[in-house]
């Protein structure tokens, strides 16, 4: 809970003029604090961590810590959420939970700029994908176009007559940017 409240410090920090009023619970600080706590609890509920609201963040499993980081960012009400490798180190179950969370964030109207090697996550949440190979643009398009793009397949899966490329995304490690 404290991690999500810290993210809202701008709305909670009374300015010098209203500082004295805040000490006495006047001037709207109590209301701002209630709103911040409600927002934090809403995000803890959305990431299935409300029951652990008082636990130290460092005591959470790694996947939960990643979702908590995203919830902390969302407590600032961004219009664009920029994420760099949020699925790094996650197991498949945690990656699925992350992708689901990102889809709900998109549904709420927040755009996402994602840099990610987990192409399963990229394909599930992206409208448009830019694929880079060693910093060079090799493809741009929607997920279906990227999945079928020969340059993407060659760069990230290799080319071989023996390769089964029916599902190229399952085993690729491409760097993608999705928004």
List each model region and its residues.
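Glycine-rich phosphate-binding loops of nucleotide-dependent enzymes
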Residues: 1-179
């Amino acid at each position: 809970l404290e991690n999500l409240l810290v993210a809202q410090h701008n709305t909670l920090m009374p300015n010098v003029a209203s500082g004295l009023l805040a000490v006495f619970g006047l001037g709207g600080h109590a209301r701002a604090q209630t709103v911040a706590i409600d927002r934090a609890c809403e995000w803890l509920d959305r990431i299935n961590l409300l029951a652990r609201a008082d636990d130290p963040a460092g005591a959470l499993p790694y996947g939960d810590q990643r979702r908590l980081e995203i919830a902390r960012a969302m407590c600032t009400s961004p219009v664009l959420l920029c994420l760099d490798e949020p699925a790094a180190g996650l197991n498949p179950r945690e990656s699925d939970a992350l992708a689901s969370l990102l889809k709900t964030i998109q549904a709420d109207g927040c755009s996402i700029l994602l840099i990610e090697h987990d192409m399963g996550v990229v394909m599930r949440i992206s409208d448009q994908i830019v694929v880079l190979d060693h910093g060079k643009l090799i493809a741009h398009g929607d997920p279906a176009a990227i999945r079928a793009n020969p340059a993407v397949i060659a760069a990230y899966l290799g080319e071989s007559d023996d390769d089964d490329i029916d599902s190229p995304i399952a085993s690729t490690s491409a760097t993608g940017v999705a928004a």
